Amino acid sequence: MVKIKEGFKGERLVSLPEELLASYRREPLINNLYVRKIGFFPRVKYHFLQKEHGCDYAMLIYCTEGKGWYRILGKQYTVEKYQYIIIPPGIPYSFGADEGDPWTIYWLHFQGKLRDQFLPSHPVPVTISPNEYSRLQDRLRLFEEIYSSFSMGYIKEYMIYSSMCLYNFLASFIYLEQFRHIMIPSQKEYPFTARVIHYMREN
């Protein structure tokens, strides 16, 4: 079976030199939470990654099309459209794309003093069900904002901004109800046509 870590058609990814990241760890607006690497992989057939000893960073994977799988702590899970996983540091794991319906994923590595505050109690896939308040596109716009800023991370102010945005991005998964609450109208009546239009935009 073919196994590929990265180098896919249409992929986008950004990383910064470890020496630069080490210097940023002294910055109070960065060292609590920051991106180490970030990317987007579209329909990545044969995608596979295994870490036999885990990593010193956490990783978020958000699947928006297709499906894949994820193995950790002796259990294997299917990861489908509108599901995400947060992989904790220090634990061996592996994951990969489904052969017949390979996933499209947005992913990032994150680190910092507050990293563990964003880890789940159980590292299993979580579903984000689309509805009229789902804000799926808002979340992807946040990702793109982080990606764009981090890609300019050689300039300290852009790195700081990417770290500030990272709080909001991670919170959009972990505090899903609160993230969606802003879309719930204060009026008692929410027009049916508005709900239909929003759903079509999200899907």
PLM regions with names:
Residues 117-187, 194-198:
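Amphipathic alpha-helical segments enriched in hydrophobic/aromatic residues interleaved with Lys/Arg
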Residues 6-18, 115-120, 141-145:
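Short, charged, low-hydrophobicity "junction" segments
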Residues 30-125:
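N-terminal regulatory/effector-sensing and dimerization cores
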Residues 27, 52-55, 185, 189:
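Residue-level marker of regulatory loop/turn positions in helix-turn-helix DNA-binding domains and
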Residues 202-203:
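Short helix/strand-capping hinge loops at secondary-structure junctions
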Residues 4-7, 11, 33-36, 135, ...:
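N-proximal short alpha-helices
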Residues 1-34, 51, 153, 176:
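A short, N-terminal "cap"/entry segment at the start of jelly-roll beta-barrel domains
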Residues 10, 17-18, 39, 125, ...:
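Generic signal for short, ordered secondary-structure residues
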